[in-house]
């Protein structure tokens, strides 16, 4: 239900979709209620304070997905930040939708996470996107940066003919 809603299926069409999946009744108001609950949970996550402990490591990434914006389904970058706390647990500490992965969008996203209390970072891990690396260096000054090995492997694999990929990677 949530995925269909995010992808732009109208609340009225959701009842038809639900019926085709074997759900006997799903009204437009129920879909709206579910969407509101989801919005509230995301809002809580995005505003939750992070000053309860120090966080050592931060992983930052983006993926493009279809999002519902102004009643339309459009492609946007969902940017995420996952941090490892001193208690040894990973937490999703940042989540947002942006139009592009520009330096300005990354800087605004990271500044929001920092303003909520993220501190103590030793290492940030991300892909080699120039705007992201610059934003990380500015927002988390003094924190070391490492290129994500998964992204590096994917980038290398894309540049090597596929017959040779298995031997090299």
Tell where the protein language model's regions lie, with residue ranges.
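RNase H-like nuclease fold core
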Residues: 20, 24-126, 130, 134-142
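Short, charged amphipathic recognition helices of the HTH superfamily
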Residues: 8-18
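Short, amphipathic alpha-helical "recognition" segments used to contact nucleic acids or chromatin
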Residues: 1-8
């Amino acid at each position: 239900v949530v995925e269909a809603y995010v992808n732009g299926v109208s609340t009225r069409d959701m009842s038809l979709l639900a019926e085709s999946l074997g759900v006997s009744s799903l009204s437009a108001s129920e879909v709206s209620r579910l969407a509101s609950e989801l919005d509230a949970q995301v809002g809580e996550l995005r505003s939750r304070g992070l000053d309860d402990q120090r966080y050592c490591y931060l992983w930052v990434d983006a993926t493009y997905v279809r999002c519902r914006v102004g009643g339309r389904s459009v492609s946007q970058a969902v940017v995420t930040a996952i941090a490892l706390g001193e208690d040894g647990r990973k937490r999703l500490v940042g989540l947002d939708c942006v139009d592009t992965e520009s330096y300005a969008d990354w800087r605004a996203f990271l500044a929001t996470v920092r303003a909520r209390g993220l501190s103590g970072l030793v290492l940030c891990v991300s892909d080699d996107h120039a705007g992201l690396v610059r934003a990380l260096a500015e927002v988390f000054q003094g924190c070391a940066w490492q290129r994500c090995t998964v992204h590096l492997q994917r980038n290398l694999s894309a540049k090597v003919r596929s017959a040779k990929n298995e031997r090299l990677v």
